[in-house]
C-alpha cells in the first residue's frame, strides 16, 4: 500500500509547523516547550482523517531531512499508538516507497530497536512542559494494523467530505 505524506516538520526541528488546510500555507504553530527535536520527518497522510479530527499523522524515516510542504510517496512499516489530551493520536511510521536503502524495512520489527525507542521517548516527553497538554499510553504495532488504520482514516475522510457536500 502506497500513499502520499506531506511533511510539516523536518527531522531535527523544535519548530512545530502545521499546514493551514484552508489556505495550503505553512504556519509556525509553536516552538516545542521541551529541548527535544523531531526524530524523523513528521507530517500527515493526505486525504485521511484520524481519530483526533486531524489528518492521520506520519513519520518518515529518511537519510536526510526534507522541508515543510514536501510530498513523499511512502509505505507504512508500523504505527505508534498513542493518546493525548484530545484522544487517539496515532503516528504511522513510514519509509519512502522507492528508496532502495529502505527496501529491507517491511514491518516494525525491521526498524532498529534504538530508533523505535528514540521515537517513543520523543512522543512520551515532547509535551511535558506545555500547560494543558499530555501524552497517555503508547505502544508500537505492526504494518498490518497501520495499514488498517490508514484505510479507516481514508474512509472517515470520505464520509466527512461526502457529509459536508450534503449540507
Regions found by a protein language model. Name each.
Residues 1-167:
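Hydrophobic N-terminal alpha-helices or hydrophobic patches in metabolic proteins across all domains
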Amino acid at each position: 500500500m502506497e500513499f502520499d505524506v506531506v511533511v510539516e516538520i523536518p527531522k531535527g526541528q523544535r519548530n512545530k509547523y502545521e499546514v493551514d488546510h484552508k489556505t495550503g500555507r505553512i504556519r509556525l504553530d509553536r516552538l516545542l516547550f521541551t529541548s527535544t527535536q523531531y526524530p524523523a520527518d513528521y507530517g500527515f497522510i493526505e486525504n485521511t482523517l484520524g481519530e483526533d479530527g486531524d489528518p492521520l499523522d506520519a513519520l518518515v524515516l529518511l537519510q536526510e531531512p526534507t522541508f515543510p510542504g514536501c510530498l513523499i510517496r511512502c509505505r507504512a512499516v508500523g504505527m505508534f499508538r498513542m493518546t493525548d489530551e484530545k484522544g487517539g493520536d496515532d503516528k504511522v511510521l513510514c519509509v519512502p516507497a522507492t528508496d532502495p536503502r529502505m527496501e529491507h524495512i517491511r514491518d516494525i520489527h525491521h526498524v532498529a530497536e534504538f530508533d523505535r525507542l528514540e521515537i517513543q521517548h520523543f512522543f512520551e516527553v515532547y509535551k511535558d512542559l506545555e500547560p494543558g497538554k499530555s501524552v497517555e499510553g503508547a505502544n508500537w504495532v505492526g504494518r498490518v494494523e497501520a495499514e488498517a488504520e490508514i484505510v479507516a482514516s481514508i474512509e472517515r475522510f470520505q464520509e466527512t467530505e461526502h457529509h459536508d457536500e450534503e449540507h
